[in-house]
Design a protein with these regions (language model features):
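Alpha-helical transmembrane bundles and membrane-interface segments of multipass inner-membrane proteins
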Residues: 1-167
Length: 167
């Protein structure tokens, strides 16, 4: 378990941060009722969006089946990432990237279980570009983790000895 500490610490941090920001913005600031709060207009606006699909509302559906399929997919990806980390025991950068995905995925699963949809509230626009989409801390985390896994988590050599053997 200690070998995977970066994975678990990152996933836990992201999950807690995601859920705390949602409680503060959606519940305490009552964004679910108000709908929009201009923080630093237009650069940062809290705009409530209930996402029943994946990124940008793709594959959204109001049926219970859609919700459960998306929960199952998120949990399957989470399980696969944990299995991969346990099997390969990669370095901390890859574990942190996987932890970003795991924490974000679980945060969005919790939303689907509590609200029936993912609570998206961050909206950023700039320089005449009006962004029509809202997102949340979990979405940012999943994106950054996926980028890290793609660019750092390949099947390249794990140690200097492996690199010498490969050349």
């Amino acid at each position: 378990m200690r070998a995977l500490a970066p994975l678990w610490w990152t996933a836990g941090f992201v999950l807690v941060l995601d859920q705390i920001t949602k409680v503060i913005v959606v519940q305490w600031l009552d964004l679910k009722t108000v709908g929009r709060i201009e923080v630093i207009d237009p650069f940062l606006v809290f705009r409530m969006a209930w996402n029943r699909g994946v990124n940008f509302g793709l594959f959204s559906g109001s049926s219970d089946a859609t919700k459960w399929v998306l929960i199952a997919i998120a949990l399957a990806i989470t399980g696969w990432l944990v299995w991969w980390m346990r099997r390969d025991k990669p370095g901390p950068v890859i574990q942190i990237s996987a932890g970003l995905v795991v924490g974000g995925a679980i945060g969005n699963v919790i939303d689907r279980l509590i609200y029936g949809a993912v609570a998206d509230f961050l909206n950023m626009s700039c320089c005449g570009f009006e962004n029509p989409y809202s997102f949340n801390v979990a979405d940012i985390s999943i994106f950054l983790g996926a980028v890290g896994l793609i660019f750092v988590g390949g099947d390249g050599p794990k140690t200097r000895d492996d690199a010498d053997k490969a050349s």
